[in-house]
Each structure stands twice: as structure tokens, then as C-alpha cells.
Amino acid sequence: MNGYMAGVARAAAETFAFPEPILEIGSLQVDGAGGIGELRGMFPGKKYIGVDMRPGPGVDSVESVEALPRPDKSVGSVIALSVFEHVEHFWRGFEEVQRTLRPDGLLLVSVPFNFHIHNYPYDYWRFTPDAFRSLLREMPTKIIGQQGPKKRPLMVWALAAGPKYPTITEAQHVQFRTLIKQYAKQPMRWKRKITYGLGRLICGKGPFAPYFEAETFESHLERVA
């Protein structure tokens, strides 16, 4: 997870009610992340369970998202940021998330699109907004978002609500967007900014757009009639 998605998670936590228990999939705090991935503190006082395929800091239980050892409809909220690119059979993982999530539950999920290979321990997939629409088609209300240029986003995310979750309003969507602008940051280091700036002058802006537009985003509130 990058700092930008941590900001999106904070914006979501301050805008929407996350029912308990909250299950974070991929909660291992990776060395060198500087605490960016520590989401537990965004939900004070709530029952929060961190699971990962490996033990370590931030992990309460070692579990595979492809076969969660949890009863049907037993989880209030699921958070899975920058996880499913590492899941070999990702469709099984999405099925497990939706199996264990209660009808009044909430899911926050993100996956990179334009991002380097990062093996934790393996890196298999990239996703588009349409992929989330397909994978989450059973969840009637969704906010689909993406970071960076429309054609080559850095990250793609979705906030999806179960059929009995309180109606997500356009006013909440507007507040969510406002807080994303406030919290979600991905500044470019000055050396890289100079290097990419020269490259943009020589090659055109297209190849470098994801980096110069990293703090731009778009999102859409979608409902199934």
C-alpha cells in the first residue's frame, strides 16, 4: 500500500460507518513502509482483526484469503488494500470476502494498475475499474475510484456496500472526495521531478503522466437498480 491509499482509507474511515468486526486482509507491516500501512488506529474502539498469509507485525491471525476460516456472514467490514495482486486465485479471494461479509457489511479494496513488480511474496495481477465492477457485481452500491490518469491509473479502488448497509448518499460521496483531496498525498521527490520533467520535454507528457498526476483522482457512486 502506498501513502495515497492510506489517505483514501482515512477518508473512508471518517466518512462511512465500518461495522464490526473489521477484518483487514494483508495486515502485515512490511519492512521499510514507515508505518504507512498501519490502519488499525483509524478505527479506535472497534474490534479489529489483522490477517495475512505470513506472521509478523500487525498480524493477529495467519489466514489465506482464498480460504478464510470464518463462518458465513460473520464479518462486519473487510479492508484489503494492495492485496489481490498477490493472490494467485484472486477470484476465490473475492468469493470468500463476499461469503464472510454480512449483508450490512462494507468492503474497501484497492489494487495497483500501473505499478512495478513487488513480490510479497509474489505479484500476479493488475486490475481496472471494470474488473471491480465485475467482481463486485453482487454488491448493489459501490464507489469506484482511481488514482492518476484515467487511461493509466496508478491505483484502482472500490468501496462496496452490502444490500442491508445504510444507503450511501451523494453527500457522503462528496465528503469522501473532499477528504481524499485533504489526506491522500503522493509527492514526488525533487530529483525525480527534475529527471521526469526533462524526460517529459523530450518524450512528451504521456509516459510521465502517472507520476505528475499522482495526486489526481476520479470516483463514481454507482447503484444497481
Language-model segment annotations:
Residues 1-16:
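Class I SAM-dependent methyltransferase Rossmann-like catalytic core
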Residues 4-8, 38, 175:
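Exposed alpha-helical structural elements
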Residues 16-118, 128-130:
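Conserved SAM-binding loop
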Residues 88-225:
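S-adenosyl-L-methionine-dependent methyltransferase catalytic module, highlighting the catalytic core
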